[in-house]
A protein has these predicted regions:
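Short, intrinsically disordered linker segments that flank or connect zinc-binding domains
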Residues: 15-18, 119
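Short amphipathic alpha-helical interface patches used for protein-protein assembly/oligomerization
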Residues: 50-56
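Alpha-helical scaffold in the C-terminal half of BTB/POZ domains
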Residues: 2-6, 10, 35-39, 46-49, ...
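Kelch-like beta-propeller repeat domains
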Residues: 205-614
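Conserved AAA+ ATPase "SRH/arginine-finger" region at the nucleotide-binding site
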Residues: 69-72
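Short strand-coil-strand connectors
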Residues: 31-33
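A short, compositionally biased
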Residues: 20-27, 573
Length: 614
């Protein structure tokens, strides 16, 4: 039986380390701080460019000496490095990692350097982020320094309250601002921080002016800029005149801010962020995926942003023991299987994934678990599970605090119509309290429907209920908490998507059934005019597909992937089509916008992500 390479390497290392420990065939002794380390030249040279140059070059006196004294490294660190060279084992902790990195950099053992940088990347926190950035720069680990600086920017609100902020070098602050890393405070607050920093360090006016030149003045309104004049800081007043001379025109400033207001769900600060198209989950040739792909409009390419996480514990307690057992069983599935048919929403530029289902051995398991993704910090956290396990429901954000979940296929101990009606088919999630609350129920229960929010009103249309495809449209006023039935859609429809631009709602995609119960694609985009409570045909879809992902990017409706109805095989598509509501024209850029793989049943959203990650 053949031995794998890894097993052979382990066997070789064990043999070499045994020879070293026994002092057999060793041909060099390293002396560090009075400590003696016996080793084999060839082993050291194979692992270190430093030792390779020392022992392979006959002109080097060390190549002929049996004992070599090393300076600039500690004996403890050298011991760890030699153990790693002979065993591939490296014991790192917060107390010895800097010492080990310094020694590994000195003797050029790349694998140890990499282990140290990975260890420190995982340990970056508010207490050490500046120290790690400074250390990384000293040892030339610029990727690690970038990670630390990006952490500082993503947590700038908290970092600014620490003593490290005032201890940050002027060159470091200038560097991170010039890199345009995303930050978690408004640009106006950044101006105040810089002024405070300048006052504390008693910077010369020229130095502060250089920092202020890096401010994104287009993200500060005229009224906000006036508030700076009331601060008790003379340098602010002096610089404002320079701003008027050097900044872009106020019309451009206002136009940029108006755009942010229209988009509604923008980040705290636009610095270093770009509006991007996200494709979430769905089916590909390899099956159901948890990947979240992102299309960068500046680089015109797709890349993997993140993935819907697996959770390994059930944090919520329930007063229903039987339901606890069911949820724990479903939890064991969520750890190992990708999810589908979940609810998706963007609130305050954070992505929420709630509920969904898993197919295991042709049986569907619905689960209640939820996740929240912050693109600024590239991090996921769990949220409270939804009260009624749901899939194929709508999830929509209202304002800056709430998510509304409506309808869907549900799973509960008593799933009768009467029981579900008593439970309510509508729930609201509060991001402040991390709780779900039942809301007034939608009279017509449904799943595979669509929902969209305009102002403080939630609109629901279509879907399936008791094997009947619906055309009805409803509106929920989140202020009065009342439902109102509106004009029905021109045709019954399910598995479609609603998007809103101005005071018009667009129903995109979906299908309905003929009298013979065969599925027929909806070939048009229908527009609902809110003021007149009427539907009309907006446009014909050039190549309609089943299960396309649909969203809007500014004033354009985008269709991603889907299943072609005209093909019996190879039905899946990677095509991305878009409809401009202002010009009434469709476009398709095959070489850039199309997804890397064929995809269907994915969910699409637009949100701001850091431009530096792509």
């Amino acid at each position: 039986m053949s031995t794998s390479v890894s097993q052979a390497e382990k066997s070789l290392l064990r043999g070499l380390n045994r020879l070293r420990s026994q002092g057999k065939l060793t041909d060099v002794t390293l002396i560090v701080e009075g400590h003696r380390f016996k080793a084999h030249r060839v082993v050291l040279a194979a692992s270190s460019d430093y030792f390779c140059a020392m022992f392979a070059d006959c002109a080097m006196i060390e190549s002929r000496k049996e004992e070599v004294t090393l300076y600039g490294v500690s004996a403890r660190a050298m011991s760890r490095i030699i153990v790693y060279i002979y065993t591939s084992l490296l014991e790192l902790n917060v107390d010895n990692v800097e010492e080990t990195l310094a020694a590994a950099t000195h003797v050029q053992v790349k694998e140890v350097i990499d282990r140290c940088t990975v260890f420190m990347e995982q340990k970056i926190s508010m207490d050490n982020c500046l120290a790690i950035a400074s250390m990384a720069e000293i040892y030339g680990q610029f990727a690690l320094a970038e990670r630390a600086y990006r952490y500082i920017c993503a947590h700038l609100k908290e970092f600014a309250t620490t003593s490290d902020f005032k201890e940050m070098k002027l060159e470091q602050l200038h560097y991170i601002l010039s890199c345009n890393y995303p930050i978690d405070i408004p640009e106006l607050e950044l101006v105040r921080l810089l002024c405070s920093y300048g006052f504390e360090l008693q910077l010369k006016e020229e130095a502060l002016v250089e920092l202020l030149r890096l401010i994104k003045w287009e993200f500060i309104s005229t009224e906000e800029m006036k508030t700076l004049r009331y601060q008790n800081h003379s340098l602010v007043e002096e610089y404002l005149a320079k701003v008027q001379e050097t900044s872009i025109s106020q019309e451009t400033i206002n136009a940029s801010l108006d755009l942010c207001l229209r988009l509604g769900q923008g980040p705290t600060n636009m610095r270093g962020m770009e509006l991007s198209l996200l494709k979430i989950g769905g089916f590909e040739w390899k099956g159901l995926t948890n990947e979240i792909m992102c299309f960068s409009t500046s680089k015109m390419k797709w890349y993997e942003l993140t993935a819907i996480p697996h959770i390994d514990q059930c944090e919520q307690q329930s007063s229903h023991p039987h339901r606890d057992q069911l949820r724990l069983f479903r939890l064991s599935l969520i750890i190992h299987h990708p999810t589908g048919n979940f609810g998706t929403a963007v609130l305050n530029n954070e992505l929420f994934i709630v509920g969904g289902a898993y197919d295991v051995c042709l049986k569907e398991y619905i689960h209640p678990f939820g996740f929240r993704y912050c693109p600024l910090r590239d991090s996921w956290v769990t949220i409270a599970p939804i009260q009624l396990d749901r899939c194929r429901f709508s999830l929509n954000a209202v304002g800056k605090q709430y998510l509304y979940a409506v309808g869907g296929s549900v799973e509960y101990e008593d799933s009768s119509e009467d029981a579900l009606r008593r439970m309510s088919n509508v729930e609201r999630y509060d991001i402040v309290t991390n709780t779900w609350t039942y809301m007034p129920s939608l009279q017509e229960n449904r799943s595979q429907h669509a929902g969209v929010v305009v102002g403080d009103k939630l609109y629901i249309s279509g879907g399936i209920h008791l094997a009947t495809i619906l055309a009805s449209t409803w509106c929920f006023d989140t202020k009065t908490e009342c439902w109102q039935e509106l004009a029905p859609m021109p045709t019954p429809c399910c598995d479609h998507v609603l998007v809103a631009i101005d005071n018009r709602i667009y129903a995109c995609g979906g299908w309905h059934e003929t009298m013979r119960e065969s599925r027929v694609l909806v070939e048009h985009i229908y527009a609902y005019d809110i003021p007149t409570n009427s539907w009309s045909v907006e446009t014909k879809i050039p190549a309609p597909k089943f299960y396309s992902g649909v969203t809007t990017m500014r004033r354009t409706i985008i269709f991603v992937g889907g299943l072609d109805s005209t093909e019996s095989i190879d039905r899946a598509s990677s095509e991305t089509m878009a409809y401009d509501v202002d010009t009434g024209k469709w476009w398709h850029h095959k070489d850039s916008w199309d997804t890397p793989n064929d995809v269907w049943e994915s969910t699409c959203v637009t949100m701001y992500v850091p431009s530096c990650v792509s």
